[in-house]
């Protein structure tokens, strides 16, 4: 089963990807992870990517798609894969389709986790962090004492990019970027939109039901 997973920040995409990996035994392919791995290992494409990254520039699509193609050709992808964070644009989706045709691994289904903005803003802007690594949520998992970490007694804080205004900006960027891709895969008849506001386990049961139809 070859899957693309879409979902805005805070929709629970990472949680569902992990559940898919555990249940189906197929790898989650994160473009950020494989890019860093190629740079670290000094592969030809990794060195090409590093030249752009060192200048603070975006890695061009032709380099990125080469890295993805190599990753999808690895042994652990034989039974399927979950693509997370790619494609981000319609030209990338076209390039992906070309390489998947070449290696005979077409996308079976595109899962789109949908959650209203106000719910996402509440989920993300409620996050609190501590320098010791502990994390809290003002509603779902608040510290026992206001603004004090249960574990180390340090002060908990909100990251700047988790503040409501910053979250809304991130969501606006995501929608602007992703909507053309939603339309793209909808036209191909492989897009399934799921309600991401439900309980984590219920969402996963919904995903399994969808995948059973596409298997």
From Swiss-Prot:
Consists of three domains, a large central CORE domain and two small peripheral domains, NMPbind and LID, which undergo movements during catalysis. The LID domain closes over the site of phosphoryl transfer upon ATP binding. Assembling and dissambling the active center during each catalytic cycle provides an effective means to prevent ATP hydrolysis. Some bacteria have evolved a zinc-coordinating structure that stabilizes the LID domain. PANTHER family: NUCLEOTIDE KINASE. The gene is adk. Zn(2+) binds at residues 130, 132, 149, 152. Pathway: Purine metabolism; AMP biosynthesis via salvage pathway; AMP from ADP: step 1/1. Residues 30-59 are annotated as: NMP. It comes from the Archaea. Its main location: cytoplasm. Catalyzes the reversible transfer of the terminal phosphate group between ATP and AMP. Plays an important role in cellular energy homeostasis and in adenine nucleotide metabolism. This is Adenylate kinase. It is found in: Cytoplasm. Pfam families: ADK, ADK_lid. GO terms for biological process: AMP salvage. GO terms for molecular function: adenylate kinase activity; ATP binding; zinc ion binding. Keywords: ATP-binding, Cytoplasm, Kinase, Metal-binding, Nucleotide biosynthesis, Nucleotide-binding, Transferase, Zinc. PROSITE patterns: ADENYLATE_KINASE. HAMAP family: Adenylate_kinase_Adk. It is an enzyme of class 2 (transferase). Monomer. It catalyses: AMP + ATP = 2 ADP. AMP binds at residues 31, 36, 57-59, 85-88, 92, 159, 170. GO terms for cellular component: cytoplasm. Belongs to the adenylate kinase family. Its EC number is 2.7.4.3.
């Amino acid at each position: 089963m070859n899957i693309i997973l879409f979902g805005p920040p805070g929709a629970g995409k990472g949680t569902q990807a992990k559940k898919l990996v555990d249940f189906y035994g197929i790898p989650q392919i994160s473009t950020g992870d494989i890019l860093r791995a190629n740079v670290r290992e000094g592969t030809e494409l990794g060195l090409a990517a590093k030249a752009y990254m060192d200048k603070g520039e975006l890695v061009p699509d032709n380099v990125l798609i080469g890295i993805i193609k190599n990753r999808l050709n690895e042994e652990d992808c034989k039974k399927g894969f979950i693509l997370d964070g790619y494609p981000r644009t319609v030209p990338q989706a076209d390039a992906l389709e070309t390489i998947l045709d070449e290696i005979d691994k077409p996308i079976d289904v595109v899962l789109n986790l949908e959650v209203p903005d106000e719910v996402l803003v509440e989920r993300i802007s409620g996050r609190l962090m501590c320098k010791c690594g502990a994390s809290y949520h003002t509603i779902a998992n608040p510290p026992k004492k206001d603004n004090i970490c249960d574990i180390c007694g340090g002060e908990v804080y909100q990251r700047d990019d988790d503040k409501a205004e910053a979250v809304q900006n991130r969501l606006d960027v995501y929608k602007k970027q992703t909507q053309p891709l939603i339309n793209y895969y909808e036209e191909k008849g492989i897009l399934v939109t799921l309600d991401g506001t439900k309980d984590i386990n219920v969402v996963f049961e919904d995903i399994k039901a969808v995948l059973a139809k596409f298997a």
